[in-house]
Amino acid sequence: MKIYHGRKRGLIIMDHWLSLIFIIGFIIVHFGSKYVKLSVASPRSFWFSLFGGATIAYMFLFLLPELNQYFEAVKSNVGDSWPSILDNYTYLLALIGLIIYFGMDLYARSRKDVDEEDPDSTSEPVLLVHMSTFVFYNVTIGYLLIRGEFISGMDLTVYFIALSAHFIVTDFTLKELHSGVHDKYGRWILSAAVLIGWLIGALYELPTWIVSIAISLLAGGITFNVFKEELKESTFKNYFAFVGGAFVIAALVMVFT
């Protein structure tokens, strides 16, 4: 994320402890998805739209602007040899991320239609293929939780709130597609992935160009997954919930980041 020089050591240590608390929170969100009942069919739950609005606001107001900073950092490291054709490469990668997640979602849904009467309507191999994209998702989010140079504990807290909201939506989407298989395996895989990302960040600082690619693909995936859900049989109630979630996170981002 942003690089802030001259931060006090005590603040950095506090943020690391806070990130540990939040990584545990992410894991609880994934495990708790088995026990929370929300409507994914029509009428869709008010909460899905609220969480979707919160996530998309965070992406547009925080993640996408960060791509510019990473792009400038990568470009300055390369120097004059940087090809002008790649001046928008971070946004191109975000588009590629959207396309990848769209394709994987279509694949999973096409496999589900093969046998609608099976309670575990998609097989374990299909779940694992689909889940691989969300493993990348979670590893990136876990890494940024500790390596993102947030300016304060509140800044980090806004990140946790927005991404927790998104995890709730994606967990229920995966449950809709993969039924009992997700409860049996998926939530374990997602919990492990976000923890692994955090551990990588605790032990290593990845090169800027790798982080920029990861955030770009993540932004594309978030865009697809949020709007895919909002375009399903939504009502004005869902719309106003979406606007409310977006407004709250937008206000928090503007105040604390």
Model-predicted segments: where are they?
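Intrinsically disordered, metal-sensing/regulatory segments
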Residues: 1-257
